[in-house]
């Protein structure tokens, strides 16, 4: 019983080649988004299907674009930039374009014995988007960037009480 439900939701990928071609994944059908611009790459993924009420009321996706950089292990690092929404003609879903700029760090003194390390540094202003398994998440990034994401789950609603006087 458990296995049969999961097995029916497995994704089947078909080849994706040009704009206008149809991509079918069991629960998510969509038109191929445009190719990335020069100096960019495209990340495309679909989310696991959930009940409609859960998707619309209880889940959000946080996009975490960033780069792997050498850091000192002491300071806090972040990348400036912006994430914008784009609608393309013929597509019924939103695409996102990320512009990553300079990396900044806090100004803590670094001890001489600290060793530099490679670490993923994320964009300072993260984007929360609605969870929707029926549409793909398409993000255009600079070639040297990576995309991480988190699924946020809402908790139980709590009614705020009036402040006592």
Curated annotation (Swiss-Prot):
Gene Ontology molecular function: serine-type endopeptidase inhibitor activity
SUPFAM superfamilies, A to Z: Ecotin, trypsin inhibitor
Gene Ontology CC terms: flagellum attachment zone; paraflagellar rod
One Pfam match: Ecotin
Top-level taxon: Eukaryota
Membership in a protein family: Belongs to the protease inhibitor I11 (ecotin) family.
Protein name: Ecotin-like protein 4
Origin species: Trypanosoma brucei brucei (strain 927/4 GUTat10.1)
């Amino acid at each position: 019983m458990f296995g049969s439900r999961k097995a029916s939701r497995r994704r089947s990928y078909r080849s994706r080649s040009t704009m206008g071609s149809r991509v079918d994944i069991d629960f998510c059908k969509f038109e191929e988004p445009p190719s990335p611009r020069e100096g960019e790459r495209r990340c495309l993924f679909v989310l696991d299907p959930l009940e409609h009420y859960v998707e619309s009321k209880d889940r959000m996706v946080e996009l975490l674009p960033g780069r792997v950089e050498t850091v000192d292990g002491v300071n806090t690092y972040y990348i400036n930039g912006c994430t914008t929404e784009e609608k393309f003609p013929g597509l019924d879903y939103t695409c996102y374009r990320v512009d990553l700029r300079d990396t900044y760090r806090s100004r803590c003194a670094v001890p001489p014995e600290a060793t530099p390390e490679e670490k993923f540094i994320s964009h300072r202003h993260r984007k929360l988007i609605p969870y929707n398994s029926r549409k793909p998440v398409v993000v255009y990034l600079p070639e040297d960037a990576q995309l991480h994401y988190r699924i946020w789950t809402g908790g139980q609603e709590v009614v705020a009480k009036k402040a006592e006087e």
